[in-house]
Design a protein with these regions (language model features):
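Post-Walker A helix-loop "phosphate-sensing" segment adjacent to the P-loop in P-loop NTPases
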Residues: 67-81
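Hydrophobic positions on the alpha1 helix immediately C-terminal to the Walker A/P-loop
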Residues: 60, 64
Length: 306
């Protein structure tokens, strides 16, 4: 931060605090807040996607990056126009990152404009990036110039500061993220889920976020399936209804296949019932309440549901 010269031992220069009246605020013309990826990722927004290791978080992050850079779509979300993206990857080997982007490129059918996606891949760095360190924040800043979306993959590898479950450990990264928002950028964090299924570490991360998405394993998920998950919006600021309802996504040979989470559950329940399982046995198999199984059976019996 530059500023007026300071005498030796004086406090570092800081911008003056600005207060305005309600009348001034109401008279202020703010530019409309656009969507980077509709309906859940706004411009100057802060969001997080978390899930178990190996479930498909990086697949999702790269798919989002490609959609935003090309003005395209990914899963059930749409980018209204092309925007520049910077991906900070702290975990994936370079060859794996290259392979996944090549796969996305082949299936997308549209190329990213030159320079619209730039990456800081872990394998290409001589040292790790740590967003909790002010020196690394300052070094990174020139590389973010012109970017609209910054994807941080992931918090555990790129924001190491103290103990992960302590709220204070998040504060330096939160300060950096809020600075990005003031600069007009959107930040999307990726994070791991803990053993209980919730995001790992302090829940204080969610305080300043617009959107929190959990990627969860469907009840019948098998490890060999790879990228297949249920998308759940745990925090949805500014949108609701159908746009915020959970759905399932699976990556196949031809690309991503989606279906409503309710329909997927009905299908699983009816399949188990067809195998002769009782309501109690189905509930135990899927790890849900009997009342939920009964509702699914009722829905599955409706005309046109199967």
């Amino acid at each position: 931060m530059s500023g007026p010269a300071q005498a030796t031992g004086a406090a570092p220069w800081r911008p003056a605090l600005v207060l305005i009246s309600v009348e001034e605020l109401l008279a202020t013309e703010f530019p409309p807040r656009e969507m980077v990826l509709s309906p859940w990722l706004p411009s100057k927004g802060l969001a997080m996607i978390y899930g178990r290791r190996g479930l498909g978080k990086t697949h999702v992050a790269l798919g989002i990056a490609w959609a935003v850079a090309t003005g395209g779509s990914f899963l059930r979300w749409t980018a209204p126009r092309q925007r520049r993206v910077v991906i900070l990857d702290g975990e994936m080997p370079g060859e794996a990152l290259k392979a996944r982007l090549a796969e996305i490129s082949a299936k997308a059918g549209v190329a990213v404009p030159e320079g619209f996606i730039r990456l800081a891949a872990a394998d290409l760095q001589e040292r790790s990036i740590n967003l909790a360190e002010e020196a690394d924040q300052r070094e990174l800043e020139p590389h973010l110039a012109g970017a609209d979306l910054v994807i941080v993959d992931n918090i555990s590898t790129l924001a190491a500061y103290g103990r992960e479950n302590e709220a204070e450990s998040w504060l330096p990264v939160q300060t950096w993220a809020l600075g990005q928002r003031r600069a007009g950028r959107t930040v999307l964090f990726l994070h791991h889920a803990g053993k209980g299924g919730a995001q790992r570490g302090t829940s204080r991360r969610e305080d300043v976020l617009d959107t929190v998405i959990a990627l969860r394993e469907p009840p019948d998920y098998q490890q060999a399936e790879g990228a297949r998950f249920a998308v759940h919006f745990e925090k949805a600021r500014g949108f609701h209804g159908k746009a915020a309802e959970p759905f399932e996504a699976a990556l196949g040979e031809a690309g991503w296949v989606m279906r409503d989470a309710v329909d997927a559950e009905v299908e699983r329940v009816m399949a188990l019932r067809a195998e002769g399982l009782s309501v109690r046995e189905v509930a135990e198999e899927l790890g849900v309440a009997r009342s939920r199984v009964e509702r699914a059976i009722k829905r599955g019996a409706e005309p046109g549901s199967q």
